[in-house]
Amino acid sequence: MELKVNIAIDGPSGVGKSTVSKLIAKKLNYTFINSGSIYRTIAYHVIKNDIDINNEKDVISSLDSLEFSLSKNEELFYKGENITLILRSEQISISTPVVSKIPEVREFVTSYIQKMTKGKKGFIIDGRDTTFKVMPHADVKIFLWATAEERAQRRVDQNHQLGYNSNYDEVLYEIKKRDHQDMNREHDPLHKTEDSILIDCTNMKIDEVVNKIISLIK
């Protein structure tokens, strides 16, 4: 039996972190934790409860009443309701960076994941600060990259499959805006750490990326 390790996958919005992580988790029988979905759940929670998303104090206070759970098949439940597909809506995509830039929100998510993984192996965690904040001691660190144009097209295709109609130019604008926010935020800005392996997946198929990462693990 091969010894399991912990894998952290970082990278910008829409690069395919979750898709790749899910496939790797399935192939290696690992547990996948999508940090982005937790941030999206917080955004959903704030909107659902008519909280002003720009009022940091109220957003932070709302964390005390947040009830959610992750299933083994990577579905997310909010107070018993499966909101996995709802979390991919455009409204949630636009609102998530507003809440995720709040330091207390980031600490909440980081603490949640670290408690789940403490003293354990066989986890694959993705996010935009996973390699240096959430899982700084991960055995394998990957930084996925792709051009904004490629990521925008992938997002449009993904939304179409989920039943959402998206305009390419609008999605591209939002992705570039998100990149700027992530790379320039005051706390834990997105960046590649020295010990992370860079994989430019702009012209790679998903299975090629998956196999590349698995080869690095083994």
UniProtKB/Swiss-Prot annotation:
Please state the Enzyme Commission number of this protein: 2.7.4.25
Q: Which InterPro entries match?
A: Cytidylate_kin, Cytidylate_kinase_dom, P-loop_NTPase
**Top class in the EC scheme:** transferase
The record's listing under CDD domains reads: CMPK
Keyword Metal-binding in record: no
Could you tell me where this protein is found in the cell?
Cytoplasm
Per its UniProt record, what SUPFAM superfamilies does this chain match?
Answer: P-loop containing nucleoside triphosphate hydrolases (SSF52540)
- One Pfam annotation reads Cytidylate_kin
Q: Which reaction does it catalyse?
A: CMP + ATP = CDP + ADP; dCMP + ATP = dCDP + ADP
Gene3D superfamilies xref list = P-loop containing nucleotide triphosphate hydrolases
Q: Which GO terms describe its molecular function?
A: ATP binding; CMP kinase activity; dCMP kinase activity
Binding residues for ATP, per the UniProt record? 11-19
Keyword annotations from UniProtKB, A to Z: ATP-binding, Cytoplasm, Kinase, Nucleotide-binding, Transferase
Q: Name one GO biological process term.
A: pyrimidine nucleotide metabolic process
Any GO CC annotation of this UniProt entry: cytoplasm
HAMAP family associated with the record:
Cytidyl_kinase_type1
Q: Which family does it belong to?
A: Belongs to the cytidylate kinase family. Type 1 subfamily.
Query: What protein is this chain from?
Result: Cytidylate kinase
Which organism was this protein described from? Mycoplasmopsis synoviae (strain 53) (Mycoplasma synoviae)
Q: Which gene encodes it?
A: cmk
